[in-house]
């Protein structure tokens, strides 16, 4: 059973749903068919290869828990290359913003080789990553500058995670990185 499109801790909900299905009398074959046919929707959990890079685009929304879960997937992605966490700020955290972004930075240090943080809380993410010993952690307040730096550092075979709050428009950074046209 190959469930590669949905990796890591993010599969726990699918396992719970499968267990409920079994309890309600569904056959294991029907449940397996449902799991195998899973397709990511919109800007969530899109894992693919393009231009020699492994891309994990999860740009719809973000929270500290979601950041940790997607970073754990990045950490488990196959390949001989490095792992880049390209993370936008998590908006609407209120009083928890500083700690939430530091937490995301610490998780990036655990699962990635480099952090490219973007947005008003990028410095807090970088601080969290450096607390855990990550040397390659950078803060940007401009997506164009982030993409230029990322293009210098990332090489074919590397895995890149793009994630952030909807307002950070991380899909735009991904499109720029891949050389696609983007709206201003």
Sequence positions of predicted segments:
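ATP-dependent carboxylate-amine ligase
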Residues: 6-9, 16-184
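Beta-strand/loop nucleic-acid-binding surfaces
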Residues: 1-4
């Amino acid at each position: 059973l190959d469930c590669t499109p949905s990796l890591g801790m993010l599969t726990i909900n699918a396992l719970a749903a499968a267990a409920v299905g079994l309890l309600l009398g569904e056959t294991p074959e029907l449940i397996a068919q449902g799991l195998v046919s899973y397709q990511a929707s919109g800007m969530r959990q899109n894992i693919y290869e393009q231009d020699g890079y492994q891309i994990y685009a999860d740009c719809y929304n973000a929270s500290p828990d979601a950041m940790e879960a997607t970073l754990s997937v990045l950490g488990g992605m196959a390949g001989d290359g490095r792992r880049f966490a390209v993370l936008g700020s998590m908006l609407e955290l209120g009083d928890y913003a500083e700690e939430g972004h530091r937490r995301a930075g610490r998780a990036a240090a655990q699962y990635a080789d480099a952090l490219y943080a973007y947005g008003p809380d990028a410095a807090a993410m970088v601080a969290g990553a450096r607390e855990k010993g990550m040397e390659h952690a950078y803060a940007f307040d401009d997506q164009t500058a982030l993409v230029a730096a990322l293009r210098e550092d990332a090489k074919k075979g590397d895995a890149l995670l793009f994630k952030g709050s909807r307002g950070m428009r991380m899909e735009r950074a991904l499109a720029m990185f891949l050389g696609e046209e983007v709206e201003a």
